[in-house]
Amino acid sequence: MPFLRKRGEYMRRIIVDMQNLLFADAIARTLRSADSDFDVRRSESPDKTAELCSLCQPYALLMEVTGYTPWKLEERLKIRDEAKEQSPHCKIVLIVDENAEKELARRVLQAKKDGLIDNFIYGSVSAAYLLAVIDTL
């Protein structure tokens, strides 16, 4: 179940797997905001993300995509496959810097069009928009 019961309310588990630790902390803080119902956990490293998904059964998995191993799109899609195998209802959201990685951003967009991911977010969006996207998955 992708929900955790906490203090009489249901909390949606979110796993964040990002290369940029400052960005990851900012996303986690945004998702934990006073009005949200998210239980946010950070993956220690990409090689532990699928295992964490198996243990936590998350509502959503947010992963940063870059041009560098182990954050390349192909590697992220492998993690997606492993996560979906253990948690079929888990929503997959990729985050990409559309200014620094234009071609990669185009490929992430195509992955969404092809149905490989549930959504994507550009790194330049506001915290409020990020929260709204995750809330409406």
At which residue positions do the language-model features occur?
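Conserved phosphotransfer cores of two-component systems
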Residues: 54-56, 82-89
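Two-component signal transduction core modules
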Residues: 61, 92, 119-120
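Conserved phosphotransfer microenvironments
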Residues: 61-86, 96-99, 107
